[in-house]
């Protein structure tokens, strides 16, 4: 089932690139959660670096940024260090959370990209399927709305 605006996100607890647990039930701020296909690929690097470059804007708007793919902790750590990413990359190695969100595949086999704006109560407020561009258009009102 594909999640839509107004839906409650599923409860999850995943490790990030440093081995820290990130859990949906600990949200204290709005969350920009972006699903991407794979570490160290051209499109994913552009996407991740775009969030890196706009990270301060998201913080000003009161939002955390988390990336998520099926890469390992080691892969995520290398990708984050190489590109100086200051936000967590979560490991969804069996695509369980990706499937719970209903993130579609492209061409039937390439993991898709979707960005969700989620409020602190875990409700999806906006969905963008156009890399970072759509998410960056959402700068006012704040992601809390």
Range-by-range predicted roles:
Residues 26-42:
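Short active-site neighborhood of thiol/selenol oxidoreductases, capturing the structured segment around
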Residues 66, 77-112:
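Short, internal strand/loop/helix patches
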């Amino acid at each position: 089932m594909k999640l839509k605006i107004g839906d409650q996100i599923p409860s999850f607890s995943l490790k990030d690139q440093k081995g820290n647990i990130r859990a949906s039930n600990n949200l204290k701020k709005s969350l920009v959660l972006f699903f991407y296909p794979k570490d160290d690929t051209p499109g994913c690097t552009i996407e991740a670096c775009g969030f890196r470059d706009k990270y301060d804007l998201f913080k000003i708007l009161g939002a955390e940024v988390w990336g998520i793919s099926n890469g390992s902790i080691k892969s995520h750590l290398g990708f984050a260090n190489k590109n100086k990413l200051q936000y967590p990359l979560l490991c969804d190695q069996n695509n369980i959370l990706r499937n719970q969100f209903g993130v579609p595949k492209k061409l039937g086999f390439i993991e898709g990209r979707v960005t969700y704006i989620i409020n602190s109560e875990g409700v999806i407020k906006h969905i963008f399927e156009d890399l970072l561009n759509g998410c960056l258009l959402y700068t006012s009102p704040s992601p809390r709305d």
